[in-house]
Amino acid sequence: MATIGALVLRFFFIAVLMSSQKSWAIKEEHTIIQAEFYLLPDKRGEFMFDFDGDEIFHVDIEKSETIWRLEEFAKFASFEAQGALANIAVDKANLDVMKERSNNTPDANVAPEVTVLSRSPVNLGEPNILICFIDKFSPPVVNVTWLRNGRPVTEGVSETVFLPRDDHLFRKFHYLTFLPSTDDFYDCEVDHWGLEEPLRKHWEFEEKTLLPETKENVVCALGLFVGLVGIVVGIILIMKGIKKRNVVERRQGAL
């Protein structure tokens, strides 16, 4: 794959909630992260704000538009997209300088970990969402394809932006709405520069195997039979013990 130069700027702002008590003891701590990057040769960037690991908003660089993770957030705050565009321009200029100073040495590739799971317990015929969680990777470039029965799916898919981690790696979520069926199976295929080949994670509906009633009856009858045998054997051993003791007592009486 093509060589990549990546500049990732992360600014951490710690908002500390102080107790109103006289001791002013720290009761809780929250973190707001402003994460931005610019990538080459893709010539694209990302600008977003994160609160305690959840996205607040990101800026669509191409559309110069602020996209709030939840629409309700826009009622209480605002952010001018032009500010993000100005930051990305600075990132690009800094990246050019860093490329020269590093003799065009690319950043290291860290392959992702991939997990596929459902949003909620799966029941046949009830709509659900599959989640493809891509974690601990760098640089922030991945190609993700959903497959149903081995064929690409493009409808009902969505995704998050690249989300920062405390260790300067990234994570990302991809979603697929689906109707659970025993006839369908799904795969999330992830391609990243840290992988030798695309990585697939498989998911299919697994029906809970309940013990048939006939088998239950057999097992119950077998258990009852074993119990009865144990009781009979126990009674026989007790009778033999009593008989043996009586014989010994009669012999001792004769003496």
Curated annotation (Swiss-Prot):
Main location: membrane
InterPro entries: Ig-like_dom, Ig-like_dom_sf, Ig-like_fold, Ig/MHC_CS, Ig_C1-set, MHC/Immunoglobulin, MHC_I/II-like_Ag-recog, MHC_II_a/b_N
Region annotated Connecting peptide, chain positions: 204-216
Ranges of the Cytoplasmic topological domain: 243-255
Pfam families in alphabetical order: C1-set, MHC_II_alpha
GO CC field: external side of plasma membrane; late endosome membrane; lysosomal membrane; lysosome; MHC class II protein complex; plasma membrane
SUPFAM superfamilies in the record: Immunoglobulin, MHC antigen-recognition domain
Top-rank taxon: Eukaryota
Assigned protein family: Belongs to the MHC class II family.
Protein name as catalogued: H-2 class II histocompatibility antigen, E-K alpha chain
Organism for this UniProt entry: Mus musculus
